[in-house]
Amino acid sequence: MKRPQADFVRRLADIAWAHSGDKGDMVNLGVVVHDEADYALLLREVTEQRVLEHFKDICRGEVRRYELPNLHAINLVLTQILDGGPMRSLRLDPQGKTLGDSLLIMALEDQSDPASKSTPGR
């Protein structure tokens, strides 16, 4: 039975996990796909521009993306996002630990239902 399109929103969390941490006033976001078959999708969807748009209310700097193909992962560096860093910021999350989870709620533009893509052996 096919789900109605309105009920289905594919998010980054459906294909990957993330870990984040601070480096002064910068944050590193490591994003790793669950299945190496989704690495190309990760590269298409998680661009520097889309990440900057996702964090537009709190990121005053830039986003740099580093590809790690052997790990099926990317590392994102967001600058000027922690209001001066953990020792100066009055933010609730001065180390940016919640930003990885925040990124995972980003909707993917590719809204094809992964359940409709059968993989042999699964």
Where are these regions (language model features)?
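Long, contiguous binding/interaction regions
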Residues: 1-122
